[in-house]
């Protein structure tokens, strides 16, 4: 009976002040740790090997500097089929840094530049007959996680079709919307970029590939926000920093003052693995210097 997909300018956040995930009273790192463990444990109990996260500096790739998604851990070597996956199927919670939304940080109340992408991946291959699960079972696992583990009302979950592409691959995808917030994206990756491809997605040509890959992304911080119900995601993820900065700088509750803790967290995330981030052209371009 919905008139919108749940993620439009007409849809408000229904979880603000009324969390859609109950039973989580923690905030900050304690909440993230508990939420992360609940996710990983769910998939580990369902036959997925738990992997340690990869570095946020994508040293194994020559097309990107930063790890921007969990699937980036496996592109291009595993997704192309040249290298076997480290486990199959697998689950991981991958720290990411993504600067494309930097202008929206602090304005929307939900955008982040550093975040963790919880995920479960499966690598199916037609030529070898290796098959784990595909679309139906992927959606079933997602639904079970949301309803049985996190107690979300199933009537509040909306699955929105929206093709995905990135890193030379593409596929059909479902965005998972609850309470006006996109919690996850389920990608059914079976296409590879090719100049003679017959399938066009977002201006690029693709062709079918031998592998059929389950590529999912669940926003850890967004799950935490949905469990906390704070006015913005920043009070959930950085509660101590927000309180300290408001007190010391005499900030009021305006959202645009809340991006400072996130900037600090992103900077520390980049410096820790050995990369210095330097802005060379304000608002337009970033340069990364490996140390």
Where are these regions (language model features)?
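Cysteine-rich micro-motifs
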Residues: 2-10
